[in-house]
């Protein structure tokens, strides 16, 4: 029999998902003055409110467990937030506004927020269901990787931000790591071929190996079910002890979809973060706005501010803005924002210092800076980003723009 939680006279806000988005929302709601909410935060993982961004630093042994919290859950509990961890929501009833948890208890809401995040995308490769094929999304994933003893052979699938951070962390722990990436260069969504080559050179110096332009065709398993070899497209069989999938994410939409809420790539929301159903909202990696999903922190933090404004009865509106990208690898400095692959109507400005491994590429359209790649010296990244955000006309400084703010010092609009 379901155990019913006690009702409250205040507006009952229930947040499904206790990752970064859900935990910060609960924490910031608690600190918002003149609000009359009771807040319940429900998480699938046993750890609540940790900084997922820092998982790669934890894996690389650059930080300790004590540096992982994003919010102070003890203070949140004292402040009245009811936190349920390790007990995922398995079903919901839109008419009764009731959630069913795996433990058997039920939670009733007045307003519901989906902050269910995403899961690692497991590619449809033969053998991918083996127990030593894993994602890199949770603290538990890091615990599995750090438990590897000796020098193990690890295959990382995906040369994006997450895959490269995982690869470097595993190399720092003494393992032999090979990264498979379908594109011909790393971080192909953030870098061009030339800057990516500089990055690859640096990562190879650190010990990471690469197989570019290909994905494994199969994983060979032993009688125990574990993957023992990666089959390359060339036919080569590469010995492996662990496979880490970092080839993208899949928004966690199962609960919303089963309830009949509009879902496309993710849970569809409007500018107020509201879903297709009254009193139900979504934010973070599980939501989709104007056919765009969100995997970086900056827009998600903006979504939290907008949603708190809306929940407080005021007018809030989420707008998509350019978001810069940085790689969290010690000793590697890169910055990317905006349009990096120019069209025929765009002008490109380059600066290269091969000896110092410095590279700059600026994309300009009709007097406006629209895209930036910096590798090596990234000190001007925030200034370039400000120029893009403010739509500052840079026509009168094009000759010196690539050298940075110190040479231009324009009046930012």
Give names to the regions the model predicted.
Residues 129-150, 226-231, 236-309:
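FAD-site-proximal beta/loop scaffold in flavoenzymes
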Residues 2-82, 169-190:
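Beta1-alpha1 glycine-rich phosphate/pyrophosphate-binding loop at the start
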Residues 20, 24, 46, 118-120, ...:
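Residue-level detector of alpha-helix initiation sites
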Residues 2-12, 18, 31, 286-382:
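Mid-to-C-terminal Rossmann-like scaffold of FAD/NAD(P)H-dependent oxidoreductases
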Residues 16, 107-119, 238-248, 304, ...:
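Short hydrophobic core segments
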Residues 236-260, 332-413:
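C-terminal catalytic lobe of FAD-dependent flavoproteins
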Residues 116-173:
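Glycine-rich dinucleotide-binding loop and its adjacent helix/turn
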Residues 38, 77, 83-100, 107, ...:
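A Rossmann-like FAD-binding core segment of flavoenzymes
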């Amino acid at each position: 029999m379901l155990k019913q939680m006690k009702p409250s006279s205040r507006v009952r806000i229930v947040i499904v998902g206790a990752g970064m988005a859900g935990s910060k929302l609960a924490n910031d709601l608690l600190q918002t003055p003149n609000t009359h909410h009771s807040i319940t935060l429900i998480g699938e993982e046993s750890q609540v409110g940790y900084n997922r961004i820092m998982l790669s630093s934890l894996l690389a042994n650059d930080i300790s467990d004590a540096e992982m919290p994003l919010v102070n859950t003890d203070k949140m509990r004292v402040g009245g937030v009811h936190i349920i961890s390790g007990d995922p929501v398995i079903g919901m009833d839109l008419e009764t506004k009731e959630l069913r948890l795996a433990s058997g208890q039920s939670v009733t809401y007045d307003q519901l927020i989906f902050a269910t995040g995403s899961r690692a995308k497991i590619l449809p490769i033969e053998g991918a269901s083996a127990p030593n094929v894993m994602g890199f999304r949770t603290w538990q994933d890091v615990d599995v990787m750090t438990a590897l003893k000796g020098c193990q052979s690890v295959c990382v699938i995906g040369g994006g931000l997450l895959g490269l951070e995982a690869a470097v962390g595993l190399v720092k722990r003494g393992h032999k790591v090979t990264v498979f990436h379908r594109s011909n260069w790393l971080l192909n969504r953030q870098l061009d071929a030339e800057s990516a080559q500089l990055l690859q050179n640096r990562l190879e110096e650190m010990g990471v190996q690469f197989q570019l332009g290909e994905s494994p065709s199969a994983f060979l398993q032993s009688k125990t079910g574990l993957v023992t070899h990666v089959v390359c497209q060339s036919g080569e069989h590469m010995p492996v002890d662990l496979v880490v999938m970092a080839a993208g994410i899949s928004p966690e939409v199962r609960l919303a979809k089963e309830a009949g809420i509009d879902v496309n790539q993710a849970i569809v929301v409007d500018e107020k973060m509201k879903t297709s159903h009254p009193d139900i909202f979504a934010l973070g990696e599980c939501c989709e706005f104007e056919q765009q999903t969100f995997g970086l922190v900056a827009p998600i933090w903006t979504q939290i501010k907008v949603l708190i404004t809306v929940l407080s009865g005021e007018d809030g509106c989420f707008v998509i803005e350019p978001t810069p990208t940085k790689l969290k690898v010690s000793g590697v400095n890169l910055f990317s924002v905006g349009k990096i692959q120019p069209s025929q109507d765009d002008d490109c400005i380059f600066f290269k210092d091969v000896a110092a491994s410095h590279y700059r590429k600026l994309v300009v359209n009709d007097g406006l800076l629209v895209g930036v790649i910096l590798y090596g010296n990234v000190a001007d990244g925030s200034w370039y980003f400000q120029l893009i955000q403010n739509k500052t006309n840079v026509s009168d400084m094009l000759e010196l723009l690539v050298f940075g703010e110190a040479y231009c010092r324009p009046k930012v609009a």
